[in-house]
Amino acid sequence: MNYITFPTAQHAVEKIAQEFVIYSQLNHPAHISLSGGSTPKLLFKTLAQSPYAEQINWRNLHFWWGDDRMVSPSDPESNYGEVQKLLFDHIQIPAENIHRIRGENEPHFELKRFQAELSAVISDGVFDWIILGMGADGHTSSLFPHQTNFDDENLAVIAKHPESGQIRISKTAKLIEQAKRITYLVTGEGKAEILKEIQSTPAENLPYPAAKIYAKNGVTEWYLDKDAAKLL
């Protein structure tokens, strides 16, 4: 595992923000998939501020989501809504560069629509960069232990939270694994035990999707703060 440890979550987020600047200056549009959760909120707030808000060529970045809950964008549970509030409302970015999962739609209709958009915009299915989180149960995106089909050939899937039953749409494991780069952004001491388990146990012996999903032809790295990394 490629673990990179930062003193704090803010340091990890600053590194990602610096890399957004680099991606925005490529000679082709860069397709980046975002994650929900508390640490990404820190990232979005950082990107919306100086110097990044000015340094990044937002026209060259296309944003997608690893997953989203089937709620309206105004709902506090919406991953897209969070980014809109913390980042998009504060920068100049073309509307066509934002490829959200439309949580207000009927799930099966939206699954079909979202997969069609993915196919049309990223015809080879290869993302430049996918940023993922990891739950304390080892889930990533909305791919949960004991209910993820790692061989699903579709681009996206309807998922149900194992406890709340909440419906989401998620990228499939196979689509994520085609990315040029995957960065797991994991912070806080609440993740220390599971990171230790992932480090010390072969992935095939674990139920955790975050332990099993990696870039098949690219780079996979884990950005951790020192609290998350304390048992490694």
UniProtKB/Swiss-Prot annotation:
Transmembrane segments: none annotated. GO terms for molecular function: 6-phosphogluconolactonase activity. Gene3D superfamilies: 3.40.50.1360. Keywords: Hydrolase. GO terms for biological process: carbohydrate metabolic process; pentose-phosphate shunt. Its EC number is 3.1.1.31. It is an enzyme of class 3 (hydrolase). It catalyses: 6-phospho-D-glucono-1,5-lactone + H2O = 6-phospho-D-gluconate + H(+). It holds the Pfam family Glucosamine_iso. Pathway: Carbohydrate degradation; pentose phosphate pathway; D-ribulose 5-phosphate from D-glucose 6-phosphate (oxidative stage): step 2/3. InterPro entries: 6-phosphogluconolactonase_DevB (IPR005900), Glc/Gal-6P_isomerase (IPR006148), NagB/RpiA_transferase-like (IPR037171), PGLS (IPR039104). The keyword Disulfide bond does not apply. Hydrolysis of 6-phosphogluconolactone to 6-phosphogluconate. Belongs to the glucosamine/galactosamine-6-phosphate isomerase family. 6-phosphogluconolactonase subfamily. This is 6-phosphogluconolactonase. It comes from Aggregatibacter actinomycetemcomitans (Actinobacillus actinomycetemcomitans). The gene is pgl.
